[in-house]
Regions:
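Amphipathic, membrane-inserting segments
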Residues: 47-90
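Low-complexity, small-hydrophobic/phenylalanine-enriched stretches
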Residues: 1-35, 166-168, 172-173, 177-180, ...
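Glycine-rich, low-complexity segments
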Residues: 1, 19, 24-62
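Short, ordered beta-strand-loop transition motifs
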Residues: 11-14, 55-69, 112-119, 162-164, ...
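Ser/Thr/Gly-rich low-complexity blocks that favor extended beta-strand/coil architectures
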Residues: 73-152
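Short, hydrophobic/proline-enriched secondary-structure or compact coil segments at domain edges
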Residues: 1, 69-75, 85-92, 119-122, ...
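Extended, well-structured beta-strand/loop surface patches
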Residues: 16, 144-166, 191
Length: 217
């Protein structure tokens, strides 16, 4: 039996019981009470360095080049960001629930880190170097994550779980916002178009599958 998907009732030979519900009219005595909670996730979850932008300062140099100085939120006392120079940053803002109607993605290249003030300086990627063909500046309350890095190979991978895409994926060799087939390390769930369109792959679009770049056995 399973705590989450079992049915009916049962007691095994060791005296472990599972039931759908239990009513006790007088009292219940137990040695230890363990409460299991189920945690739900909506949207996307990335296993990588992440921060929240507290405020944004636009900086223009003598040549007219615009950068953005991001003041990051302190997550606890003494916190400083783990972001590093060369990081490809993906930022998402969604305030639709608050009624402001703001929802967009920002792609940035990290140019400087100041851990003393917990600030970073970033440049925006050009529109034609982003997946949607349109980029947006960072803003207050935006969540940012390291997508990859254009300098350090050790920082060019991350794992993300997406309830919107229906996939668990490890990205590898990520040096820019736009991904290609060489950036997929493993995939569980919905396969990308480059795999579903391959006539040698026996799956249709929308089928659940497992893809691994290298399998050792």
């Amino acid at each position: 039996a399973s705590l989450f998907d079992g049915r009916g009732a049962g007691i095994d030979k060791d005296g472990n019981a599972e039931v759908e519900s239990l009513r006790v009219r007088s009292y219940m005595q137990v040695m230890e009470l363990i409460i299991n909670r189920m945690r739900a996730m909506d949207g996307d979850l990335a296993l990588t360095e992440g921060d929240n932008i507290e405020s944004v300062e636009e900086v223009t140099d003598a040549e007219g080049h615009v950068s953005y100085k991001l003041h990051l939120k302190q997550q606890w006392e003494g916190y400083y960001t783990a972001q590093a120079v060369g990081n490809v940053l993906k930022g998402v803002i969604n305030t639709l629930a608050q009624g402001s109607g703001t929802y967009y993605t920002s792609w940035m290249l990290l140019k400087d880190v100041d851990t003393a003030t917990n600030t970073i300086t970033v440049d925006l990627y050009p529109d034609d170097e982003t997946p949607a063909g349109k980029n947006f500046p960072p803003c207050d309350m935006m969540n940012i994550i390291r997508w990859g890095n254009n300098i350090d190979p050790k920082m060019q991978s991350c794992i993300y779980l997406s309830s919107t895409e229906g996939v668990i994926k490890k990205l590898i060799h990520v040096t820019k916002p736009i991904l290609d087939e060489g950036n997929d390390g493993f995939i569980i769930g919905n396969l990308p178009e480059w795999l579903t369109k391959d006539p040698s792959v026996p799956v249709d679009e929308g089928d659940d599958a497992v893809y691994v770049k290298t399998l050792l056995y």
